[in-house]
């Protein structure tokens, strides 16, 4: 596989970890609407 796919996968897993840790926390979720879906 090429390096770009590896980097993208690493970034995606970081984002999922951040989402899992952040989005249940209202103040973090509000500050990160792009990862937590916002717009409610």
Curated annotation (Swiss-Prot):
<dbReference type="GO" id="GO:0005576">
    <property type="term" value="C:extracellular region"/>
</dbReference>
<protein>
    <recommendedName>
        <fullName>Alpha-conotoxin-like Qc1.4b</fullName>
    </recommendedName>
</protein>
<feature type="propeptide">
    <location>
        <begin position="1"/>
        <end position="19"/>
    </location>
</feature>
<dbReference type="GO" id="GO:0030550">
    <property type="term" value="F:acetylcholine receptor inhibitor activity"/>
</dbReference>
<dbReference type="GO" id="GO:0035792">
    <property type="term" value="C:host cell postsynaptic membrane"/>
</dbReference>
<dbReference type="GO" id="GO:0090729">
    <property type="term" value="F:toxin activity"/>
</dbReference>
<dbReference type="Pfam" id="PF07365">
    <property type="entry name" value="Toxin_8"/>
</dbReference>
<feature type="disulfide bond">
    <location>
        <begin position="22"/>
        <end position="28"/>
    </location>
</feature>
<feature type="region of interest" description="Lacks the Ser-Xaa-Pro motif that is crucial for potent interaction with nAChR">
    <location>
        <begin position="24"/>
        <end position="26"/>
    </location>
</feature>
<dbReference type="InterPro" id="IPR009958">
    <property type="entry name" value="Conotoxin_a-typ"/>
</dbReference>
<comment type="similarity">
    <text>Belongs to the conotoxin A superfamily.</text>
</comment>
<keyword id="KW-0872">Ion channel impairing toxin</keyword>
<keyword id="KW-0008">Acetylcholine receptor inhibiting toxin</keyword>
<keyword id="KW-0629">Postsynaptic neurotoxin</keyword>
<dbReference type="GO" id="GO:0099106">
    <property type="term" value="F:ion channel regulator activity"/>
</dbReference>
<keyword id="KW-0528">Neurotoxin</keyword>
<feature type="propeptide">
    <location>
        <begin position="37"/>
        <end position="40"/>
    </location>
</feature>
<keyword id="KW-1015">Disulfide bond</keyword>
<feature type="disulfide bond">
    <location>
        <begin position="23"/>
        <end position="36"/>
    </location>
</feature>
<keyword id="KW-0027">Amidation</keyword>
<feature type="modified residue" description="Cysteine amide">
    <location>
        <position position="36"/>
    </location>
</feature>
<comment type="function">
    <text>Alpha-conotoxins act on postsynaptic membranes, they bind to the nicotinic acetylcholine receptors (nAChR) and thus inhibit them. Has possibly a distinct nAChR binding mode from other alpha-conotoxins, due to a different three residue motif (lacks the Ser-Xaa-Pro motif).</text>
</comment>
<keyword id="KW-0800">Toxin</keyword>
<keyword id="KW-0964">Secreted</keyword>
């Amino acid at each position: 596989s090429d390096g770009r796919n590896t980097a993208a996968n690493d970034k995606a897993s970081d984002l999922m970890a951040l989402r899992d840790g952040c989005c249940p926390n209202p103040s973090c979720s509000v500050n990160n609407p792009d990862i937590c879906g916002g717009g409610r």
